[in-house]
Amino acid sequence: MDDEAGHLKAAFGDSSDGEDFADRPENRSLGIGDSTVWERVEEINGLWLCRNFLSIHHQSDLLSAILNEGWFVEETINQAMRFGDLPSWATELCDLILETVESVDLSVLPADLLWREPLFDQLIVNLYQPGEGICAHVDLLRFEDGIAIVSLESPCVMRFSPAEADEAEDVDVLLSPGSLILMSGEARYQWKHEINRKENGFQVWQGEEINQKRRISITLRKLCQA
């Protein structure tokens, strides 16, 4: 527990007061208002980024809720998966994503996805130590359209590359702490995504090396019906 508290303090100072993420009333209105800014990644249809999805306080509460699950107590474990009934904080996060998407007059997700219930029912939490990444992949077809990724603690560059060889160039997107990226349509099915650390184990953004520390990502998806 001391290690968890240390990680929280290192990431957010003393902003975490121990209150559960799902219990904070302000979380229920997150994303509603002028502060939410969605950016469409022009090169890839269906790829949207919300850099300010979670405030510092929201990030701290969410990180605390994840660490309290006890998934990463052993250093050899760096991934946790859940299917069906998700933890309350994850269900709340799904609701916040839906609220944020619906709060803007933009086609951030296809309309038919917004009507499905639940929006997401599968969760992956990945813990990346400095220098770690994930190879290029397209998510399995056992999952429906629409994938959400929330980033915590440390920034990283996610690289998108065409799933089939063509003349399209790779596209890099900076995922900052508290950001939300959504993939649907072409972005979900026709582009691979990765966190590439093959060169010296670190990443560079706009000519500057990223100060990479521990990073936690939350991926939300919807299983296809049998």
Where are these predicted regions, by residue range?
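Non-heme Fe(II) oxygenase metal-center motifs and adjacent flexible, charged/small-residue loops
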Residues: M1-A226
